[in-house]
Amino acid sequence: MNQYETVFILTPVLSDVQMKEAVEKFKGILQAEGAEIINEENWGLKKLAYPIQKKSTGFYQLVEFNADPTVIDKLELNFRRDERVIRFLTFKMDKYAAEYAAKRRSVKSNKKED
């Protein structure tokens, strides 16, 4: 199993309930394929660097997970088919990126405890 990180942008016309529903759909796809979700972050509504599909903002979502490489094809196919997703990027984390992400998560959890 490899460690991956996926960032996807949902269309800004969604309500909070619809946004959470879309995120749960993709997490469900990962879990159904045997992936282990490590971390999930909602970055909220952010301005895009350039307009995509005539939209200048979008809901950013990050998911870190461990999975087999075959799972990525199924996940990205579902991203392409879903009209709510306007962009996505999945990449395999090397050992340094995985260590950095773990360190970042631990610092973030320490800040929440304070």
Swiss-Prot record:
SUPFAM superfamilies: Ribosomal protein S6. Keywords: Ribonucleoprotein, Ribosomal protein, RNA-binding, rRNA-binding. InterPro entries: Ribosomal_bS6, Ribosomal_bS6_sf, Ribosomal_S6_plastid/chlpt, Transl_elong_EF1B/ribsomal_bS6. It comes from the Bacteria. One of its GO terms (cellular component) is ribosome. One of its GO terms (molecular function) is small ribosomal subunit rRNA binding. Signal peptide: none annotated. GO terms for biological process: translation. Binds together with bS18 to 16S ribosomal RNA. HAMAP family: Ribosomal_bS6 (MF_00360). Belongs to the bacterial ribosomal protein bS6 family. This is Small ribosomal subunit protein bS6. The lineage of its organism: Bacteria, Pseudomonadati, Bacteroidota, Bacteroidia, Bacteroidales.
